[in-house]
């Protein structure tokens, strides 16, 4: 399964930004390992969307749990899982 992880910020930007450097390092590690294949902030900057590689729900939850934003309580995630039956080459 693939998973869309939609985060919503729970704190004002100045509080979220205190944890942002650690979050970005975590994100680089997840992308580098292929666990996250696409990520970015929402246009209105109220949160972000991350798309995982092919993995089970427990692995996707582990990604969320390792995010410094989760540990700091500045964001929460909603997970939408899908089978990814149609995909571009390389995914």
Please tell me what each predicted stretch does.
Residues 1-91:
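Conserved, structured core segments of small domains
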């Amino acid at each position: 399964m693939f998973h869309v992880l939609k985060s919503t910020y729970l704190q004002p930007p100045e509080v979220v930004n205190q944890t942002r450097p650690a979050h970005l390092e975590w994100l680089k590690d997840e992308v580098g390992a292929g666990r996250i294949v696409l990520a970015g902030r929402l246009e209105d900057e109220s949160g972000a969307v991350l798309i995982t590689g092919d993995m089970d729900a427990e692995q996707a939850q582990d990604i969320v749990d390792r995010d410094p934003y989760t540990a700091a309580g500045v964001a929460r995630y909603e997970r939408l899982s899908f089978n990814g039956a149609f995909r571009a080459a390389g995914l």
